[in-house]
A protein has these predicted regions:
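Short beta-strand segments in beta-sandwich/barrel cores
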Residues: 8, 26-31, 49, 73-74
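Surface loops and adjacent helix of pleckstrin homology
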Residues: 14, 32-34, 55, 79-80
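Conserved beta-strand and immediately adjacent loop positions that scaffold enzyme active sites
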Residues: 18, 28, 40
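Short alpha-helix-to-loop micro-motif enriched in aromatics/charged/Gly
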Residues: 34-40
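Cyclic-nucleotide recognition modules
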Residues: 40-82
Length: 82
């Protein structure tokens, strides 16, 4: 699947039931502070997985928003808890 710059893979608070492999492009992991400033906490690049690991592993709502930094292609891997 292809994502354009600025497209969100996941929003903070969404269930995290997937991970993906980055074929091209890159992604940033963003959290917002109480004064609405953006804080980048991580990146995923070509050849890496893009996933909010703690929330994926423990089946919790996402703690971060994951955003494409450029046109990017990923391979999705889904998991059904339960």
């Amino acid at each position: 699947m292809v994502y354009c710059k600025g497209d969100q893979l996941e929003r903070e608070g969404d269930p995290a039931r997937w991970m993906a492999f980055v074929e091209s492009g890159c992604f940033k992991y963003v959290n917002r502070s109480s004064d609405d400033r953006e804080h980048i906490t991580w990146f995923s690049f070509v050849g890496e997985f893009v996933v909010d690991y703690p929330t994926f592993l423990y089946d919790r709502p996402s703690q971060t928003t994951i955003v494409a930094m450029m046109t990017s292609r990923i391979l999705w891997l889904f998991y059904n808890f339960g």
